Amino acid sequence: MKPAVDEMFPEGAGPYVDLDEAGGSTGLLMDLAANEKAVHADFFNDFEDLFDDDDIQ
């Protein structure tokens, strides 16, 4: 017997959206772009210049 979805995910479906419900992949991309983006408060952005090719030897 396979577990039902509500048994596998008792807290609900979460932020996931079925492609058919989102109106296809284009609608899903628009939904993703419209959502607010957040970064963890203690994320330390210490990246050097990733695209700096002058330091390649």
From Swiss-Prot:
The modification Phosphothreonine is found at residue 26. InterPro entries: CSN9_metazoa. One of its GO terms (cellular component) is chromatin. It comes from the Eukaryota. GO terms for biological process: cellular response to UV; negative regulation of protein neddylation; positive regulation of cell population proliferation. Pfam families: MYEOV2. Keywords: Cytoplasm, Nucleus, Phosphoprotein, Signalosome. Belongs to the CSN9 family. Component of the CSN complex, composed of COPS1/GPS1, COPS2, COPS3, COPS4, COPS5, COPS6, COPS7 (COPS7A or COPS7B), COPS8 and COPS9 isoform 1. In the complex, it interacts directly with COPS3, COPS5 and COPS6. Isoform 2 associates with CSN complex. Isoform 2 interacts with COPS5, CUL1, CUL3 and RPL11. According to PubMed:26456823, does not associate with CSN complex. PANTHER family: COP9 SIGNALOSOME COMPLEX SUBUNIT 9. This is COP9 signalosome complex subunit 9. It comes from Homo sapiens.
